Amino acid sequence: MSWQHFKQTWLIKFWAPAPAVIAAGILSTYYFGITGTFWAVTGEFTRWGGQILQLFGVHAEQWGYYKLIHLEGTPLTRIDGMMILGMFGGCFAAALWANNVKLRMPRSRIRIVQAVAGGIIAGFGARLAMGCNLAAFFTGIPQFSLHAWFFALATAIGSWFGARFTLLPIFRIPVKMQKVSAASPLTQKPDQARRRFRLGMLVFIGMIGWALLTAMHQPKLGLAMLFGVGFGLLIERAQICFTSAFRDLWISGRAHMAKAIIFGMAVSAIGIFSYVQLGVAPKIMWAGPNAVIGGLLFGFGIVLAGGCETGWMYRAVEGQVHYWWVGLGNVIGSTILAYYWDDFAPALATSWDKVNLLNTFGPLGGLLVTYLLLFTALMLIIGWEKRFFRRAGLTPAKESV
């Protein structure tokens, strides 16, 4: 394989979602085994909100939620912080390789309102449920935590309401029509593309170098950044967004991303099971109303905002300003939840059991139940897709894998 062929195929063209999501599932499994924690982002965003408040004299470290998730240190001294920095770096490098970085402003003020409001709702819901589309879903279900199943189902329902809500006339922005005599060809500036590709390589090499230097003295932090770079490359090149997985189901009937997510969790689950059998403790959260309410809010919020936690991250570094607002909303929403946590927690979360399916059904039973539930979810998705297209008189498009 020549360099130019490799460059075009793997560094410039978008990747098929299914193998990329499966790769993310495998990578998240090794991340858990090596660092002892799961791939998650909103917990760290919540810490960012708390530390911003500290700069203004607010003693956020005294709040119950920050005692729970630990506000100590900085992003440079926390595993989650270094992993997220690696994700941003990986996303940015991948976007530069493909010359996919351009400052794009929101087309109307209503889009900014959507971004901030949706981000706040999603951030609040995610932290109420102790995780977003990662910790309470994609990496939560393979941890065999019952709360992740509650969250996943509630997120699907919330996203349905979000999809219906965003179709209201208030969110329809006017489209300016311009008369033309011929189609404009899509063009790229070769010199700009080459410069950005080189810059992307510098960013990539810089992130890898930073991670390796850190690993020499603090192995887990350095490895967390390396994993983050890998996660960032995957989500940007394959455009992995859980919002589109849910929204596309309800609006267009497309289920390709949703099925890919199921496959990714199925691959991850057996790996997590192996680590748990070797003695690594799984991350189990409260299976209470917090998971259901949080999932409903999160599902609604991500569709309103137009992006989930992974989706807004890669789109933000591509220059889509709309998603800067979504990210800001996420931090605000999660920080608001942290402020009110002590009021909500006893009734909605901490008085409920943390249910580990491996303990409830036994190791093999818990694994079997998880795969049965994943298979059921896959069948429901396939059934919905067929029903949607049958009612529309269409045939589902075959997508590359």
Swiss-Prot record:
Sorted UniProt keywords: Cell inner membrane, Cell membrane, Membrane, Transmembrane, Transmembrane helix, Transport
The keyword Transport is assigned to this record: yes
Record topology, Cytoplasmic segments: 1-13, 100-118, 169-198, 243-259, 305-320, 385-401
Compartment(s): Cell inner membrane
Topology within the bilayer: Multi-pass membrane protein
Pfam family name, one: Sulf_transp
Residue intervals passing through the bilayer: 14-34, 79-99, 119-141, 146-168, 199-219, 222-242, 260-280, 284-304, 321-341, 364-384
Family annotation (NCBIfam families): selen_YedE_FdhT
Protein name listed in UniProt: Probable transporter YedE
Organism: Salmonella typhimurium (strain LT2 / SGSC1412 / ATCC 700720)
Gene name tied to this protein: yedE
